[in-house]
């Protein structure tokens, strides 16, 4: 799994933003956003979803499986609530995640 943090070390005491790209894309689409949010005091987690960019393994087969993968990621990092910003397929993942794990999400931003 590849995660970019906008150049700032992760601190689980700060609010966290997960930036999720669309199908066939990578974390690179969020490069400027990563730096901006990190400079504003947020933890930034800009992932390459499985099967994309620098992340190993095959693509996951469904939105639900990717949502479960996201849940595992935030559990491993000890994040209690997360802000998800999703683009295209990342928006679908955010919607599914928010509907199934409402206690783990503080905000959801959808980008066409």
Residue ranges of predicted features:
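Catalytic nucleophile-loop/oxyanion-hole region of alpha/beta-hydrolase
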Residues: 56-67
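Membrane-interface segments of envelope glycosyltransferases acting on lipid-linked substrates or membrane lipids
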Residues: 6, 23, 42-48, 68-71, ...
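Conserved HGGG/HGGXW glycine-rich cap/lid loop of the alpha/beta-hydrolase fold
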Residues: 5-56
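Conserved hydrolase catalytic core segment
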Residues: 81-112
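Conserved acidic catalytic loop of the alpha/beta-hydrolase fold
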Residues: 65-82
């Amino acid at each position: 799994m590849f995660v970019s943090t906008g150049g700032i070390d992760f601190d689980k005491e700060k609010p966290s933003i997960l930036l999720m790209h669309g199908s066939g894309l990578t974390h690179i689409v969020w490069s400027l956003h990563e730096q901006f949010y990190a400079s504003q005091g947020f933890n930034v987690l800009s992932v390459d979803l499985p099967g994309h960019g620098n992340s190993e393994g095959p693509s996951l087969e469904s939105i639900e499986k990717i949502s479960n993968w996201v849940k595992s990621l935030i559990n491993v990092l000890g994040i209690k609530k997360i802000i998800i910003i999703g683009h295209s397929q990342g928006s679908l993942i955010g919607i599914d995640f928010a509907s199934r794990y409402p206690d783990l999400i503080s905000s959801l931003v959808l980008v066409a």
